[in-house]
Amino acid sequence: MRNVMKATTLESRFPLLAVEHGCIISKDADITAAFEVELPEVYTVTAEEYEGIHATWCKAIKVLPDYSVLHKQDWYVKEEYRPDWKKTGTGFLARSNGMHFNERPFLNHRCYLFLTKTTRERMRRQSNWSTLCRGHIIPKEIRDRETVLRFMEAVEQFARILNDSGHIRLRRLSDDELTGTEKETGIIGRYLALSPGNTDCLEDIAMSAEEMRVGSNRLCLHTLSDTEDLPAAVETDYRYERLSTDRSDCRLSFAAPLGLLLPCNHIYNQYVFVGNSDEELRRFEKSARNMQSLSRYSRQNAINCEWIEEYLNEAHSQGLKSVRAHFNVMAWSDDGEELKRIRNDMGSQLASMGCVPRHNTTDCPTLFWAGIPGNAADFPAEESFHTFIEQAACLFIGETNYRDSPSAFGIRMADRISGKPLHIDISDLPMKRGIITNRNKFVLGPSGSGKSFFMNHLVRQYYEQGTHVVLVDTGNSYQGLCEMIHRRTHGQDGIYFTYTEEKPISFNPFYTDDGVFDVEKKDSIKTLLLTLWKSENEPATKTESAELGSAVNAYILKIQQDSNIVPSFNTFYEYLRDVYRKEMEERYIKVEKSDFNIDNLLTTLRQYYRGGRYDFLLNSAENIDLLHKRFVVFEIDAVKDNAELFPVVTIIIMEAFINKMRRLKGVRKQLICEEAWKALSSANMASYLQYLYKTVRKYFGEAIVVTQEVDDIISSPIVKESIINNSDCKILLDQRKYMNRFDQIQSLLGLTEKEKSQILSINQSNDPSRRYKEVWIGLGGTHSAVYATEVSMHEYLAYTTEETEKMEVRGLAEKLGGDMEAAIRQVAERQKE
């Protein structure tokens, strides 16, 4: 069947001539430099930062020569997440996570910038002069070599201004990225097909009075092309109420409703036409005089004169540059009903900005044509309005999606808006970039905020990437995960130690595999003995610390010389009682009992010696081999209220970790202390804690303290000095419980107002269709964001701390011979039904 419609080939009307040296050259000899723009992540920018970004745009636009066009093009396209199974991992939970997010829809954002040098004649032309309906003549001016060189210098200066701002990054697009290759479609081809990815064939473009089509997609266009359509005032940003509270602000750019908050396929085009400002103002002066002379015939002329005078006064008094601007939102869909919904959504979003929604069908073809990368000079002049650079820049999109970290190492979290999985590195890349100086982390979250759930998620992923994990827990939070690892590794990892009367935890602090006792090992033994001897509020004197250190040194020397002596607390106690005390008595310079009371020391330590009530604790016959166990949990809930045992058990576990830390070279080590950190906060333990936190970074390790009580951290100066000040990564969960006293937390943790606003926005506007809780992660006081901890049902059942759910899974696992994975699968299937 023959096509009876009026038709022509794309080639005959195509406005572009060539792409050379990273520049697009049109058939009218306009030259365009193209960039990809990297904007700040959404919900992470403050009002002050938005003002800084706005000022940067204004400064950059001012360096462009006369008769230049800035065309900023933001693409928002619906895509589906596809996991990279090679990177996802082979573990049961890792693969279930990948399956959970497979085909998750999200709105992907790409931002491009096109800077075009054209001529005065081209900038004045209207839609009837579009290349859609005329031939091409190369103007003489653009053939001038000096004009081109000056423009390219201005482009370089423009890019340097934006890149130096610290908020925006520009990357020049190559020839292949513009035109495409055999395997990849270029940006020009993607625009003509309205497809963000590779396209195998070109689409027909149909233009009529009623609608415009690209392939099977019908376009819907809303324009801001007249000052009457604009709000009375524009700003750099606005308060986003859904994530704000009466104590905090969440800010978005003024044009954000036309960006990520508009959930459909669309392109937001932003144009600024830089002409000769002085010439424009002179033309306005002439127009004002004409209006003034005609004002006696029409009140409207008098009003127009007044408006023009106000515009001129503003320009001259503030030194502003007059430009023209245009903004349009172009959406598309192949479904007619969906397009109606999109049209309503676009109108609502424009209205929320204070704009008049103008659905433009007449100019859709010429505006689509002008939107071709490199063809901004073909824009119809009648579709633009006069304004100043400062006002035009307020309508630029200022934020983008959360980005994946380029690091190979990291954890998987989720985007706040769509739930798209994100790969973020909170350990290695921030260290390399100098954002943090250590990998230590401080985690604060009230009961029920998802703290243990998040920590399970974090340590599981660290473990699967080769980390040696040691956990000190007081609530069985990691039991399910530990048992799964134990089963999967056939007992090599997933070691779970718990304290019971029948089988108490026992250690031997004087044992080393190679018989080597370095300074750190000796200091840890001395600290342990001081903890056993002194009460929590009774600090040791210098003499007591020195004498105890000397006794430890002398005992170690003796066991190294005499292999018949079995290293243990029993033999140390005997050495202290029978040998060291006698040596003290024979010294020329006597030590007074008031300075070092060795009898008091022996009396206090006797309960840990043979026959004492705690003689099992420090005299283990077989050393616990933590060295090559990659996932070890110490569950010490049974002794957490025992004032004598709790500090001892905790410090010995810490000492065991330090041994692991020193001996495993080039291997990531991670120590997680839940509420057990309280045992380390006494005066005698302060130096030990400071040592651990300051030293662990040198051994490719990180210490993580997890707590839920604000009062604990506020009342403990040790925590502030040792833990918080040496933790460059801070992780906070839902703090609404403490909203009225958050100023204390803010002061203690040294949080900025920006970080405070982010933290108080946690869980304020969660999607009810998804099961997740949000968490704030701050790095070095300069980089921070809120992420969603969303997991699969299988992961949820492995991490859950709900008693009924744990009992259901564990009960079924026992029936299946201890197979936690099989039990989780069955319970998950039941819940789906």
What are these regions (language model features)?
Residues 133-161, 356, 445-450, 798-824:
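Short, cationic low-complexity segments
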Residues 85-90, 127-132, 374-377, 484-489, ...:
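Short secondary-structure boundary/capping segments
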Residues 100, 516-571, 717-833:
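P-loop NTPase motor core of the ASCE superfamily
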Residues 40, 47-63, 260-262, 355-356, ...:
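P-loop NTPase motor domains
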Residues 23-29, 102-107, 317-322, 414-416, ...:
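Short glycine/proline-enriched loop/turn "hinge" motifs that connect secondary-structure elements
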Residues 427-449, 453-460, 469-478, 495-503, ...:
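Conserved P-loop NTPase motor cores
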Residues 1-399:
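Extended, folded cores of ATP/NTP-driven motor/assembly subunits in large transport
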